[in-house]
Amino acid sequence: MSKNKLSKGQQRRVNANHQRRLKTSKEKPDYDDNLFGEPDEGIVISRFGMHADVESADGDVHRCNIRRTIRSLVTGDRVVWRPGKPAAEGVNVKGIVEAVHERTSVLTRPDFYDGVKPIAANIDQIVIVSAILPELSLNIIDRYLVACETLQIEPIIVLNKIDLLDDEGMAFVNEQMDIYRNIGYRVLMVSSHTQDGLKPLEEALTGRISIFAGQSGVGKSSLLNALLGLQKEILTNDVSDNSGLGQHTTTAARLYHFPHGGDVIDSPGVREFGLWHLEPEQITQGFVEFHDYLGLCKYRDCKHDTDPGCAIREAVEEGKIAETRFENYHRILESMAQVKTRKNFSDTDD
């Protein structure tokens, strides 16, 4: 996932379009006023094709059509909308989304065919959910962290299923998580099964809009169920008995309210973070502990691998940077190059 980067001129045009839409929605509606009520503020709970569920300030959810002039609308967008009035035969008319407020953040995912697609808007933090089963993968955690740093959205690492650890296993996992604690990331250890550790997580979620990211099988949906107080069948990623991997059931991004305060957007679009569209320099910047050593290498075009005089490699050798993180950095770069090669090969076949 990535955050669209606009030039100053493009940003000015986007802002002007937002203001024009907001002004038009209040002064010159394009639709018959007899069909719709007064403009109101709301937030998009979910998007379905050319329709969206919008929650009003009083907490009611309204199914709305979307104006054709609105090019992009995703869960989490703050909008101006108008409720539909009851028709003559007593059937309620759908409301209409008139305009979209400027976003504070937008999460997108790269797509081979359609470029970059928005997934959700106005996210405050990304909760990276991992687990000791099926496998604790620091490489996957590092990929998520690079995406968060690129998006400039705060991450929280949550390790689930700690109830399955014995004392020795807990000591090992804590040692692994210290790698992230030591470079400033917040790490929480929880169990959605026993609900151990949920209180600190609830506090971290209160008053913020979060999105949970995690591979299949880590118990992300079970954790959301425990936090939301929902029944198992409402949000679930059941684990296959044969593979140990979760079976996805969520089909559209949707915003939920936590009972303790705060919101979460549950989206199938953040199961994996595609990084292949990023430049190598962006990946390097995504490793926060590298920052103090950038620009100190002997050669300006240093690849931070076997290059002589590489300040980052020297920091690894001196124990200032975790070797595991350094290895994952190169794994990410290698996987990016492979994906780009496949994409370029596919493009030449068309």
From Swiss-Prot:
What are the protein's UniProt keywords?
Cytoplasm, GTP-binding, Hydrolase, Metal-binding, Nucleotide-binding, Ribosome biogenesis, RNA-binding, rRNA-binding, Zinc
Q: Which cofactor does it need?
A: Zn(2+)
Matching entries from CDD domains are given as: YjeQ_EngC
Biased region (Polar residues) positions are 1-17
Mind naming one GO cellular-component term on file for this protein? Answer: cytoplasm
- GO terms, molecular function: GTP binding; GTPase activity; metal ion binding; rRNA binding
| Residues that coordinate or bind Zn(2+) | 297, 302, 304, 310
- Quote the record's cofactor note: Binds 1 zinc ion per subunit.
What's an example Gene Ontology biological process for this entry? ribosomal small subunit biogenesis
Q: Which InterPro entries match?
A: G_CP_dom, NA-bd_OB-fold, P-loop_NTPase, Ribosome_biogen_GTPase_RsgA, RsgA_GTPase_dom
Positions of region (Disordered): 1-33
Q: Where is the CP-type G domain?
A: 104-273
Q: Does the keyword RNA-binding apply?
A: yes
Q: Which EC numbers does the record give? A: 3.6.1.-
Compartments annotated for it: namely: Cytoplasm
Q: Does the keyword Cytoplasm apply?
A: yes
The entry marks the following residues as binding GTP, namely 160-163, 214-222
Would you say which domain of life the source belongs to? Bacteria
Chief subcellular location? cytoplasm
Q: Which family does it belong to?
A: Belongs to the TRAFAC class YlqF/YawG GTPase family. RsgA subfamily.
Role according to the record: One of several proteins that assist in the late maturation steps of the functional core of the 30S ribosomal subunit. Helps release RbfA from mature subunits. May play a role in the assembly of ribosomal proteins into the subunit. Circularly permuted GTPase that catalyzes slow GTP hydrolysis, GTPase activity is stimulated by the 30S ribosomal subunit.
Matches recorded under PANTHER family: SMALL RIBOSOMAL SUBUNIT BIOGENESIS GTPASE RSGA, SMALL RIBOSOMAL SUBUNIT BIOGENESIS GTPASE RSGA 1, MITOCHONDRIAL-RELATED
Quaternary structure annotation from Swiss-Prot or TrEMBL: Monomer. Associates with 30S ribosomal subunit, binds 16S rRNA.
Q: What's the protein name?
A: Small ribosomal subunit biogenesis GTPase RsgA
Organism of origin: Escherichia coli O139:H28 (strain E24377A / ETEC)
Recorded name of the encoding gene: rsgA
